């Protein structure tokens, strides 16, 4: 019997689910914290845990598997260099899911998904760099 072996379809086609989870995993690796709905958070956990385990393996085949999953070489480099080193001594349990109330528009339950022992400065790093670059460009123009 296959009782309890299912997964959430989340009202999406298989290809849409696969793309959504790839994008969510990439965002989580980049920012180390994301806010999403609780069912999506519970579904993304095993995907990201397996990616971190691939990063800890560190061989070429694992790197290619990670690239095929999240499709961003820059994030795969972060996964294999930064995150793999951070969790070298931890056997699983790299992700924390915390309930975060309800969304205003449709009252959907929200959750914060973050890496355990995350780098707090990683969240918003790209935005800070973009704002600093714009400020420098304005200063040069003036």
UniProtKB/Swiss-Prot annotation:
Subunit structure as annotated in this protein's UniProt entry: Part of the 50S ribosomal subunit. Contacts protein L32.
BP GO annotations: translation
Presence of keyword tRNA processing: no
Alphabetical UniProt keywords: Ribonucleoprotein, Ribosomal protein
UniProt keyword annotation of Signal present: no
Gene giving rise to this polypeptide: rplQ
Highest taxon of source: Bacteria
Organism: Brucella abortus (strain 2308)
Example GO molecular function: structural constituent of ribosome
InterPro entries tied to this protein: Ribosomal_bL17, Ribosomal_bL17_CS, Ribosomal_bL17_sf
Protein name, per record: Large ribosomal subunit protein bL17
Similarity annotation: Belongs to the bacterial ribosomal protein bL17 family.
GO CC terms: cytosolic large ribosomal subunit
């Amino acid at each position: 019997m296959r009782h309890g072996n299912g997964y959430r379809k989340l009202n999406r086609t298989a290809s849409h689910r696969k793309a959504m989870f790839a994008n969510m995993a990439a965002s989580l690796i980049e920012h180390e914290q994301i806010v999403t709905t609780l069912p999506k958070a519970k579904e993304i956990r095993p995907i990201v845990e397996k990616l971190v385990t691939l990063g800890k393996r560190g061989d070429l085949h694992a790197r290619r598997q990670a690239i095929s999953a999240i499709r961003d070489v820059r994030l795969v480099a972060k996964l294999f260099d930064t995150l793999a080193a951070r969790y070298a001594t931890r056997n699983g349990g790299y992700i924390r899911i915390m309930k975060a109330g309800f969304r205003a528009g449709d009252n959907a339950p929200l959750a914060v998904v973050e890496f355990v022992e995350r780098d707090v400065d990683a969240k918003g790093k790209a935005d800070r760099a973009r704002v600093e670059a714009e400020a420098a460009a304005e200063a040069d123009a003036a």
